[in-house]
């Protein structure tokens, strides 16, 4: 396999390039009989699409999704579901100056040495544009998980560059382009991004995601641990350089008396584990965070080399997100949903008949 397919029972294969005619995915393993149309998918794509504020790329894409297969009379058939999103606003001429050079921090150099050929237009296959079909597939997973278990997903930006964003309330997330759960800090975030753009620079971000009402028992005990699969999936998002589950790296400074989530008849007392123990879901909220590096394509000239190994200065002229993390929240939610969907089907296949008494205790949120 060449790494274009994700999942075991619920699989997603993406295709396309940033400046090709279209991008999309083929989803296999979706159970039959679920009511599904483009209306169920489009709102998630609209959360991610470019051109929604001055702080993201100004490439104008409607990201209108088309369902090509796998749905009949408004319901899934159990056969592969193909989603297509047509590219509408490519401007390939902006990349003429980097066809023979490598952008520092980008996949140009590694794609060239791996394949011996690369598509420089918008980064080709390595572009974050390819996260759109992932969000489309994630919308299907979210719908099935909600209808089956009541599982829901939410996320927010908790840090932009060196600015930490204290959590206030989830209701703020839908009210601003940063997916910030803090309304009072928005002027500071806007000023920071305006300054970055003016100086031709970029920054990173931290995104937190949560899955609620996750059933107990998802995940495998050794090599396909649920937290390992979540980390694998989240690391597959463009520009992600770090993943935390639950308390994550804060666990290093915690004592065992603090980190271990105590159990009572009324439920778990805390949730430092992030809702996963021994690679298997506890029924608590699953919590994860990702660290996203600064965007590699910037207008400031940087030292690099060309294909012949000669020193050059590289300046990227295309339309780019000065912070990829601003639009990453729905992407991270979708990847988490895809993992849980896959493991829900795997758990149902092997352990669907298992009955344990007493029932699971409530989880600390």
Swiss-Prot record:
Keywords: Amino-acid biosynthesis, Aromatic amino acid biosynthesis, FAD, Flavoprotein, FMN, Lyase, NADP
Cellular component annotations (GO), alphabetically ordered: cytosol
Binding locations of FMN: 125-127, 238-239, 278, 293-297, 319
InterPro entries from the UniProt entry: Chorismate_synth, Chorismate_synth_AroC_sf, Chorismate_synthase_CS
UniProt binding sites for NADP(+): 48, 54
Catalysed reaction, written as an equation: 5-O-(1-carboxyvinyl)-3-phosphoshikimate = chorismate + phosphate
Top-level EC class: lyase
Gene Ontology MF term list: chorismate synthase activity; FMN binding
Protein's job: This reaction introduces a second double bond into the aromatic ring system.
Sequence similarity: Belongs to the chorismate synthase family.
HAMAP family according to UniProt: Chorismate_synth
Protein name from the UniProt record: Chorismate synthase
Organism lineage string: Bacteria, Pseudomonadati, Pseudomonadota, Betaproteobacteria, Burkholderiales
């Amino acid at each position: 396999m060449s790494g274009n397919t994700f999942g075991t029972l619920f699989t997603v294969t993406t295709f396309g390039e940033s400046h090709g005619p279209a991008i999309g995915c083929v989803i296999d393993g979706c159970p039959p009989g679920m009511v599904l149309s483009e209306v169920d998918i489009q709102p998630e794509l609209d959360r991610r699409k470019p051109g929604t504020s001055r702080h993201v790329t100004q490439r104008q894409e409607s990201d209108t999704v088309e369902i090509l297969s796998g749905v009949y009379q408004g319901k899934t058939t159990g056969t592969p579901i193909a989603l297509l999103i047509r590219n509408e606003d490519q401007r390939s001429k902006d990349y003429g100056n980097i066809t023979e050079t490598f952008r520092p921090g980008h996949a140009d150099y590694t794609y060239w040495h791996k394949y011996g050929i690369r598509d420089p237009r918008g980064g080709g296959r390595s572009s974050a544009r390819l996260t759109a079909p992932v969000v489309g597939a994630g919308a299907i997973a979210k719908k099935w998980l909600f209808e089956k278990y009541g599982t829901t997903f939410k996320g927010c930006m908790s840090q932009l560059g060196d600015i930490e964003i204290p959590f206030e309330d989830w209701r703020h997330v839908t009210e601003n382009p940063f997916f910030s759960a803090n309304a009072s800090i928005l002027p500071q975030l806007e000023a920071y991004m305006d300054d970055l753009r003016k100086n031709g620079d970029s920054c990173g971000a931290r995104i937190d995601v949560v899955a609620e009402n996750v059933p107990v028992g998802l995940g495998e005990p050794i090599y396909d641990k649920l937290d390992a699969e979540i980390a694998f999936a989240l690391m597959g998002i463009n520009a992600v350089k770090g993943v935390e589950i639950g308390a994550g790296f804060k666990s290093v400074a915690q004592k065992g008396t603090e980190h271990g989530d105590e159990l009572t008849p009324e439920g778990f007392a805390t949730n430092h584990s992030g809702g996963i123990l021994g690679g298997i879901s506890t029924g608590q909220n699953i919590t994860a965070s990702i660290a996203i590096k600064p965007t590699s394509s910037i207008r400031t000239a940087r030292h690099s080399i060309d294909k012949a190994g000669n020193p050059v200065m590289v300046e990227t002229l295309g339309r780019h997100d000065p912070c990829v993390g601003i639009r990453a929240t729905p992407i991270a939610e979708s990847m988490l949903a895809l993992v849980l969907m896959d493991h829900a089907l795997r758990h149902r296949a092997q352990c669907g008949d298992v009955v344990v008494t007493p029932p699971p205790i409530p989880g600390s949120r």
